UniProtKB/Swiss-Prot annotation:
One of its GO terms (molecular function) is zinc ion binding. Residues 563-593 are annotated as: Disordered. The BTB/POZ domain mediates the interaction with some component of ubiquitin ligase complexes. The lineage of its organism: Eukaryota, Viridiplantae, Streptophyta, Embryophyta, Tracheophyta. The modification Phosphoserine is found at S11, S15, S55, S59. The gene is NPR1. This is Regulatory protein NPR1.
Amino acid sequence: MDTTIDGFADSYEISSTSFVATDNTDSSIVYLAAEQVLTGPDVSALQLLSNSFESVFDSPDDFYSDAKLVLSDGREVSFHRCVLSARSSFFKSALAAAKKEKDSNNTAAVKLELKEIAKDYEVGFDSVVTVLAYVYSSRVRPPPKGVSECADENCCHVACRPAVDFMLEVLYLAFIFKIPELITLYQRHLLDVVDKVVIEDTLVILKLANICGKACMKLLDRCKEIIVKSNVDMVSLEKSLPEELVKEIIDRRKELGLEVPKVKKHVSNVHKALDSDDIELVKLLLKEDHTNLDDACALHFAVAYCNVKTATDLLKLDLADVNHRNPRGYTVLHVAAMRKEPQLILSLLEKGASASEATLEGRTALMIAKQATMAVECNNIPEQCKHSLKGRLCVEILEQEDKREQIPRDVPPSFAVAADELKMTLLDLENRVALAQRLFPTEAQAAMEIAEMKGTCEFIVTSLEPDRLTGTKRTSPGVKIAPFRILEEHQSRLKALSKTVELGKRFFPRCSAVLDQIMNCEDLTQLACGEDDTAEKRLQKKQRYMEIQETLKKAFSEDNLELGNSSLTDSTSSTSKSTGGKRSNRKLSHRRR
């Protein structure tokens, strides 16, 4: 299915109409004179010239580029000052200022920091490349595959969040770089879809159109009209839009005779306390008995607008219905899916949130997460020892929740088992979680936060030795050793470890399968035996061992590289980092032999 946004395919061609002169003297692109009429050969020559300039921009070797545009995530886009200065008055001024700064600071290269140029709206790498390619070639590229498409296979990718985000980012950059013809094009694209997007995305479009001001008046007026007639509540308006825009919307609602319900004082106080991350104040307000968390939609508010810790702390009070719906018909899980925060989704599911609940429009939390996540992000399987992208994690968690009823849940280890068996269980759990932290850091961190691992005491070999538990000192091999017994201080750690592993198996089966493969003790034990094995069986075992060894090598090489880099930048912290590295090896030395 062709997922190209309408209008992009045609805009990638140069025709005589593409160069009709206008009276717009603010354009960064030089136009032909009005009396000039392009013939067939002229068009072909311009296409060839455009292709040549574009190939220079796309050259993988930077092709004599002498400046860089630095994005907020640290990535850099190389470009040629002579080209951008000739094509764009904005870049001509910006680069002249950057060169003066370079000369005064004796820096090696001219760099423009995008966060200093485009401060009001976050933009991504692909939109930056699209706009710069336009400045080079005067042609609008189609969106990169998977960037303007969501992860929902049933979506037509016209008005989903990735498609809207890409258009907004290009529009904003065109506004910042003063490219009016690109503003006109993308404003038209957004006007075509603004009636099809969900109302939450309309708020985002309205905010950006307001930033662009007069350059996007048609889009601004249309978004205002939609929001005025919508049922978007005051809290959402105040948290999403500038104060003057909120006032204008309220005034227009009153003029039309529409009801404008005010937020109750006691509800507002709860929200203000949450904004201040003050859970204790929330408790005091609830004791006054003027409102409760459900009536105030406090959990919805915290999940949507507060930091993750505040939202999870509020959830731990167990005073709110996790399946309660707000006036828009959303459950808390729906809101968490919109925010794309894995830890919040995990916390809500653990507290009993239903993933099967649908919005008034018929969307489940999984559908919301998919439609908010780029296809390229969701299809990108993360490498081991690398952090996973949040959007993909959210989709993965919610997909597993859909299958949960078909999968039997693991029973946490009981304390009423043989001492030696319990000891080995503790060591296995500790090793498994330590290995998960190395191979799948993002997934492990999310599970550990929910399992409340922080604050529990780590199990190490010396902490489980009978000598330490009894307080005696071994003086000879003949001294009788007291049997292992678990201390009360270790029980919380055991529960947290078990919970972490359970969450991993429940929500991250992809990661758990790799850990199961490594933690399979029988597999490793058999590698040490087998005198009567056939040559084929020995080869299979050798291959199996090499697979496990390679996985472990990769994990530790990443860890050592990180520690090495840290030691170069901070000699003081290198000592503590080295200690951390030894600690990691010690944890993995718990493995049975």
